[in-house]
A protein has these predicted regions:
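Dinucleotide-binding Rossmann-like beta1-alpha1 core, especially the glycine-rich loop
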Residues: 46-125, 280-282
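Glycine-rich FAD pyrophosphate-binding loop
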Residues: 21-43
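C-terminal catalytic lobe of FAD-dependent flavoproteins
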Residues: 285-365
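Active-site substrate-recognition segment that forms the wall
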Residues: 15-23, 45-47, 83-88, 181, ...
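Short beta-strand to alpha-helix junction loop
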Residues: 61-64, 94-100, 138-156, 268-273, ...
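N-terminal Rossmann-like FAD-binding beta1-loop-alpha1 element of flavoenzymes
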Residues: 2-29
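Helix-loop-beta segment of a Rossmann-like dinucleotide-binding subdomain
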Residues: 82-94, 105-108, 113-161, 183, ...
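Helical element adjacent to the flavin cofactor pocket in flavoenzyme catalytic cores
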Residues: 137-196, 206
């Protein structure tokens, strides 16, 4: 029997497992598919909410703490696994921002570098970017990570740890209860028992918890993205315009996203989204009209009310914990939300006030 059973092998589940394993706990992690291959793979990897000043304090608090973790985490994983998560801090250009006064006020309150810039500044930073039609902002400290590589590195590190057992292609079929207490799960690979359970199921978390008659308000929200194969160096930093973004990778791939679709668990791609994403991409970087689209894919975000994740123990099952519902910001919030959960699991002083994230009866109603 493990100390902890983690259900879900995305970035949230794997970071939870890593922190618990670092603390000497025995961990079993079960994943219905392959670790790091759902939303953790499908996203863009920007280590910030797209427009951070538009979020409430619960999301902002997690984001602020998490942003500072990625440089060290990426170096650690590269050293331990040889896989480079490609954390890069080259800043972000916001084009056509209609609430720039609010953004600058937010930045001043936090002491965060953010400045209003003109078309010549934009051209200096990104010569191929379209001239901004309205206000433009520059955030020099923003970073991004190559999230598929981050997932690979986390999985490789966990697989090498003697106190971690990874079980992939392992579907949870129900919870095992004895004398009113949850002691494990039934899976297609047999029973898995543990003292404490952590549900990190992303968009599937609500489905999992139906087995305990818990109604978790987390739903799948589809996002489609495309990637261009462009000459290396065409774009150097993240550029965001009208809610869509271009993210450069070191090998010349340029990611463009993303749609927001209420489509259940459907992950199919379609021509309408492709046309829309190409139009957005060419409005940001006109030269992309001459570059081929190399990839088109979709992922499922775990949508939740106000994008505030559920982090903590279930009211009626004190040894069953949740860490789910991060919506568009799973990668962004993962270091802080997993640290906060592990604080609760190990009885440590919490990183921050856990109250806004607790899965209370009121939030589950």
């Amino acid at each position: 029997m493990s100390d902890f059973l983690i259900i879900g092998g995305g970035v949230i589940g794997m970071m939870t497992a890593l922190q618990l394993a670092d603390a000497g706990q025995n961990i079993t992690l079960v994943e219905r598919g392959a670790c790091g291959k759902e939303a953790s793979w499908a996203g863009g990897g920007i280590v910030s909410p797209l427009y951070p000043w538009r979020y409430g304090e619960p999301v902002s608090q997690l984001s602020r703490w998490s942003e500072g973790v990625y440089p060290t985490l990426a170096l650690r994983l590269l050293e331990e696994t040889g896989i480079d998560p490609e954390y890069r801090q080259k800043g972000l250009l916001y084009l056509n921002v209609d609430d720039d006064d609010a953004a600058l006020h937010w930045a001043r309150q936090l002491g965060k570098p953010l400045e209003r810039v003109d078309a010549s500044f934009v051209h200096q930073k990104e010569p191929e970017a379209a001239a901004p039609g309205g206000s433009a902002l520059w955030m020099p400290t923003l970073g991004s990570v190559r999230n598929p590589r981050l997932g690979q590195a986390l999985r490789a590190r966990l697989a090498a740890m003697p106190n971690v057992t990874l079980i992939e292609q392992c579907s949870v079929q129900g919870f095992i209860q004895r004398q009113g207490r949850v002691v494990g799960v039934d899976t297609n690979q047999g029973e898995q028992l543990a003292e404490q359970l952590v549900v990190c199921g992303g968009a599937w978390a609500a489905q999992l918890l139906e087995g305990l008659n818990v109604r978790l308000p987390v739903r799948p929200v589809k996002g489609q993205m495309i990637a261009y194969q462009a000459p290396p160096g065409l774009v150097q930093r993240v550029v965001l315009k009208d809610g869509r973004y271009v993210i450069p990778r070191s090998d010349g791939l340029l990611l463009v996203g993303s749609t927001l679709e209420e489509a259940g668990f459907d992950k199919a791609t379609d021509e309408e989204a492709l046309v829309s994403l190409k139009r957005s991409a060419e409005n940001i970087i006109p030269a992309l009209a001459d570059c081929p689209v190399a990839h088109h894919w979709a992922g499922l975000r775990p949508g939740s009310p106000e994008g505030i994740p559920f982090i903590g123990a279930l009211p009626d099952f004190p040894n069953v914990f949740i860490n789910a519902g991060h919506y568009r910001n799973g990668l962004v919030l993962a270091p802080a939300s997993t640290h906060l959960l592990v604080d609760q699991l190990l009885g440590r002083k919490p990183l921050m006030d856990p109250a806004p994230y607790q899965p209370t009866a009121a939030r589950l109603a």
